[in-house]
Swiss-Prot record:
InterPro entries: aa-tRNA-synth_II/BPL/LPL, HisRS-like_core, HisRS/HisZ, HisZ. The keyword Cell wall biogenesis/degradation does not apply. One of its GO terms (molecular function) is histidine-tRNA ligase activity. One of its GO terms (cellular component) is cytoplasm. This is ATP phosphoribosyltransferase regulatory subunit. Pathway: Amino-acid biosynthesis; L-histidine biosynthesis; L-histidine from 5-phospho-alpha-D-ribose 1-diphosphate: step 1/9. Heteromultimer composed of HisG and HisZ subunits. GO terms for biological process: histidyl-tRNA aminoacylation; L-histidine biosynthetic process. This function is generally fulfilled by the C-terminal part of HisG, which is missing in some bacteria such as this one. Keywords: Amino-acid biosynthesis, Cytoplasm, Histidine biosynthesis.
């Protein structure tokens, strides 16, 4: 039989889906604590702008053509570009704009056509304090998920671009960490591009390449991170995949797993595509990687009600409990025996099962253990 799965598609289990929901709730709490507003974004982008933004990378876009207008458009490849496009078309923009998002990006990556992300963008401010804020927000968010052993890896888009002199083969060598190809060009200087160090002296060699501005920005950002207790190091050979970055770039690693869980940087020229001049910085969290390392559980719900009364007292009890803010499910499978109903309820994450018989309710805390009380007595115990 032919499979109904699409190559590159991912299904999420109920446990994974519950974790995604909990991650989103944490994201809302942390991002809004820093003054960020939620922005709901289109799934689509004009393909001509994807070509302008991503260059060769636009070939990874999943594209469509409107049979009526003949316009080509693609599913969004990236949230940053979609945020900038949206902000550039909004009226009454008050700079700086702080926004956060949550959803999927799409590409023809065979490892997965769709990837979940959340993140923040700070539009309209060019200071290093803005870059620091984005890193601080994302770090606090990851910590709120119980991830404590984090390290921020810093670099600057201008470094590799200047050293490679915009040569495509050298940019590719940096991206692929091709040490042989890099050594042919850099000689002994290659050691500065492969060393990961917190020591600010690693930045001194940048003056040799007339990169004093990049050096000062990285030094200033490092001091801010140090002051606020955020662990960091410099990796001057770091390259971000998207070509629109212009300034500080970063990745946030969880050291136990060795995974980069978030990344981003400054992109001061991106809004020019849409006729604006908004300096900006931002970063995204890669939720697929979070799903790999965070514990996944069935969502806990409060009560599962089994109604054995002719007057539907169980249904009425369930409504009363929901009005009190409880999460309540009902047994609707008439043919199922009590034992199987109890097993089902506890397997689905219900904390207690309520078997309602006339004015009496049996409160099960396990498939075997219960107490008996009147319905009114039970309700008096509920907060």
């Amino acid at each position: 039989m032919k499979t109904s799965l699409i190559s590159g598609e991912r299904f999420y289990s109920l446990e994974e889906s519950n974790l995604v929901k909990e991650i989103f709730k944490k994201a809302v709490k942390i991002f809004e604590a820093f003054g960020y507003d939620y922005i709901n974004l289109s799934h689509f982008e004009p393909y001509e702008f994807q070509e302008l933004t991503f260059g060769e990378g636009s070939k990874e876009a999943i594209t469509f053509k409107d049979s009526y207008t003949k316009e080509s458009f693609g599913l969004r490849l990236d949230f940053t570009t979609q945020v900038v496009r949206t902000i550039s078309h909004l009226r009454n923009v008050k700079l700086p704009e702080r926004v956060y998002y949550f959803g999927k990006v799409f590409s023809l990556d065979r490892r997965g056509f769709e990837k979940l992300q959340t993140g923040v963008e700070l539009i309209g401010e060019k200071s290093i304090l803005a870059d620091f804020e984005v890193i601080q927000v994302l770090t606090e968010f990851l910590k709120s998920l119980g991830l404590k052993d984090l390290k921020v890896i810093l670099s600057h888009a201008g470094i590799v671009r200047k050293v490679a002199d915009e040569r495509e083969e050298l940019l590719r060598a940096f991206s692929e960490r091709n040490l042989e190809a890099l050594k042919e060009v850099l000689g002994n200087d290659i050691k500065f591009f492969v060393e990961v160090s917190k020591n600010p002296e690693v930045l001194n060699f940048l003056e040799k390449y007339d990169l004093e501005k990049e050096k000062e920005e990285l030094l200033e950002l490092g001091k801010l991170l140090e002051e606020f207790g955020i662990d960091y190091a410099y990796d001057l050979g770091e390259v971000r995949n998207f070509p629109y970055y212009t300034g500080v770039i970063f990745e946030i690693y969880e050291l136990k797993s060795g995974k980069a869980l978030a990344g981003g940087g400054r992109y001061d020229n991106l809004s020019k595509i849409y006729g604006k001049e908004y300096p900006a910085t931002g970063g995204a969290v890669y939720l697929e990687r979070l799903l790999d390392i965070l514990p996944k559980n069935v969502e806990k719900k409060d009560y599962f009600v089994i109604d054995k009364t002719k007057k539907r007292l169980g249904l009425k009890l369930a409504d009363v409990l929901r009005e009190k803010g409880k999460k309540v499910g009902m047994e609707i499978v008439k043919e199922r025996g009590l034992e199987h109903s109890l097993i089902y309820a506890f397997d689905k994450g219900f904390k207690e099962v309520l078997l309602v018989e006339d004015e009496i309710v049996k409160v099960y805390t396990t498939p075997k253990d219960y107490v008996v009380m009147k319905i009114r007595e039970f309700l008096d115990l509920i907060e």
